[in-house]
């Protein structure tokens, strides 16, 4: 049985199909971990969601910021939903949208496999978090999203404050800080305060900011973390962190990382020729 983590798909359905073919993926034996941002910008978000939803127990998903945004948009009135981009509109008005949204709300913010020794998140971990703290923060959000109270969280999801997670935070502010960390973080300062504007490669950040995994004094965790979200970082391996957002939606590659082997193995497919490589990166 093989276990692969897959970077940000963002609706790049043809590339996902080609990648699964290249992996010779067998749903009866193999497992796929998706780092999040399943939807938006690639053109075929609905097909992507249907494919991954159909994998059932063969797929594990950690939600990304685009996935959470889609869930929040789904709570708007229909006239507001009709004003979003055509790709997301197709998802919102699909006959099976309620099933797909309920499934998305049941997914994770963090996944840890003790036997494999791997942890997966979409973006990153707060410098002060232990693994157990990170799991607790993720589980708080997961419980809320899968409960009848999910609308309260999704309606208060967005905002850059608090910019840093703290054990003193409570309620919605605590969950928003955790979500910002798990799904939006790239650069932060020594106190874990996130720079929400910095989206370039390491070395382009503002003074006093660091890639989240290079913060001085960071709690070094005896684990390996696989994450996406940061296409300007690209394929990265260092300090126990493996970045696999290789910018497929921008004309780069879609990347899988095999996890169940002593030396992690990268497998990639090129983006479809029509995808345009853009300078910089979106959220």
Question: Language-model segments: which ranges?
Answer:
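A general structural motif
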Residues: 27-30, 56-58, 120, 222
